Amino acid sequence: MILRAGLIGSSSGWEELLRQCGVPIVAVKAGGEETFSVLIVARPPDPAETSFIRRYLAGGGGVMGSSAYLETLVERREEQVHLAHIVPEPGGEIGGLSLMDIETTGFLPREANCLRTDDLQFAVFAGSIAGGLAVVTPFDPGELLGDFRAVERYFYARPDRLPSERVARVAKGELTHFVAGALKFLHHGRGIPFARLSPFPAGAHNVCAIRIDTDGGTEEEVGDLLAISRETGIPFTWFVDAGSHSGWLGEFSRMTGQEVGLHCYEHRIFLDARKDEENIRRGAAALEKAGVHAEAFAAPFGFWSSDIARAIDGAGFRYSSEFAWACDAYPQHPFADFARYSTLQVPVHPVAIGTLRRCGYTPAQMSQYYRDVVAAKVVRGEPLFFYQHPGHGHWD
């Protein structure tokens, strides 16, 4: 046995989820050797694959898949239900989760015994079956990862008024935690260690980055924030909407020790592929003329679409950051319309100081909000990636 996941079916979503979990992958064919420690079913299996899955379970194997794919093993309810959230259960079979926004439909397993739906029905089956262990979900996690629709989502905070931002409809970071928790259950429940690669480089326990979207900030506001970076010794990444700073764009080329990326020329999304590409090209050209070669990109308003992704890939950026694709998650490669995009996504926590200010938070409440977010991320092993704007103030 090799500690890795076997995958039945080609799935960009599952491959990306398993990479984020730090789990190696091998493609599986019915009749092949069982050179894996857990089996993921990413599509409806054919008869030969179904027999293979049954034999694997009978030998004490561990299987994960949706109720739509594993209905011959675990009965599902006949009526499809809407699932806005998956609600965690302290002490349940799959732990370590927060509320998971999914906004999808699915078939609940009849024998579901853990996690809860919006109306507090059990949502997931996790337990013994046919001689082995299985985790059966009412949805396909790999398919959910590819959902790039955005919604206005509220974020937990201590004050009564919760901050909100338009972000990915599916909580993709939480989805990764769910898959990792399910894999841990399938391994530990069979007396097998759940070994995984660290998400952080060079043995680091965590990483931190500060993204600044300039959003028309004045030269003075940018200078004040740059001074804080230098005083604290924390470098920032500046995403510049070049047209707003045309009179003093060269100042960004003199930001030693900082990273400067592109936030388009105009701070707008045209919803027209040609115009959006031109907005990117024009901004990149303006920065080049000012002495800045931008290798990173962030779309205005955190917008993401397959057209924007193609434009980002075409421009040759090393990474981009759009919370309409993902927020509060590990870096990942997006995919849509049967295409996997080459530019790495680096998700951030999407609540900026300006959002808290609009909610009426005092400086003390703002500080407490970010302390709470940092503490939760450290406990859960999530990267500390935040974003702000020069004009929002409250830097003390």
Regions found by a protein language model. Give the residues of each.
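Catalytic beta-strand/loop cores that center a nucleophilic Ser/Cys/Thr
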Residues: 16-21, 84-149, 338, 343-346, ...
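Helical hinge/lid and interdomain linker segments adjacent to catalytic or ligand-binding clefts
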Residues: 2-75, 230
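Metal-dependent polysaccharide deacetylase catalytic core of the NodB/CE4 family, i.e.
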Residues: 205-208, 219-220, 227-310, 314-331, ...
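A short, acidic, amphipathic alpha-helical segment used as a generic capping/interface helix at domain edges
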Residues: 121, 125, 364-380
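A glycine-rich, often tryptophan-bearing local segment used as a flexible ligand/cofactor-contacting loop or short
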Residues: 44-111, 117
